[in-house]
């Protein structure tokens, strides 16, 4: 973890001087005792202070810029949300600056630090990092941060209740008479922030435990090796992309199949795949409101089951 970014206000507190005195020292202005100046410059070096150039230029006013940090655009959730988020922010007078982490923790911090230097009024973050050290780092920026997709404990979250959405979807599948459930998900043993996937798995397990049906949790490639039984089987996938990989196999074997995210490709190609959809318009509008207020609590948006007769 990189050292936390220190502000001029924090530097002033460390040195026991006013913020104006710190400003004079850092900008080589007159009216400051040489020893005090030396003390401030030394502390700035020790604590890794770096100037926020844009903040100087607007003299404490709003930049009307919002930073967005997501994995990439391969996930349709992000591409669809970004389009709506840009429109919602533009209505409020904000311009968006988008950066991609490609699920690399170090790259994520580089993105955040770059946005800090541009003096964002807020950062919308789908985090790959997690834990107290990372959250303390974010708090040290003194910029409003809201999370999407994955959650951080001490920051607001805007999105769906992944646990409830998957629990209800699984209950629906069980209600259709399926007694053998196969849950398909990506690996969660990465050491990264996989909150959304963890919550979906937890929702699946909750529904299974209440019903008593048999179940297994597999990688999508493992599903191809499963034996066909007389049990009514359903494959429940934590993403539509996993479900699309298994759609033909499920059809061949007479299995039900369910995805999650309701990506546009399903309707565009007329694919028979049930999925769980959620309101990205509501997510975008909630984020825009957060930017205006500067603070926010969690905002959970609605989800719904989309039936296309694959269950």
Model-derived features with residue positions:
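N-terminal helix-turn-helix DNA-binding module of bacterial transcription factors
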Residues: 1-63
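N-terminal helix-turn-helix/winged-helix DNA-binding helices
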Residues: 2-6, 45-77, 81-83, 92, ...
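Short, solvent-exposed amphipathic alpha-helices that sit
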Residues: 39, 77-91, 165-168, 194-214, ...
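Periplasmic-binding protein-like
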Residues: 120-126, 180-185, 189, 231-242, ...
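Flexible loop/hinge segments that line or gate small-molecule binding clefts
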Residues: 126-165, 188-189, 241, 261-273
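Hydrophobic alpha-helical segments within soluble ligand-binding/sensing domains
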Residues: 158-183, 222-226, 243, 277-296
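An alpha-beta-alpha
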Residues: 169-213, 298-311
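Flexible loop/turn connectors
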Residues: 227-311
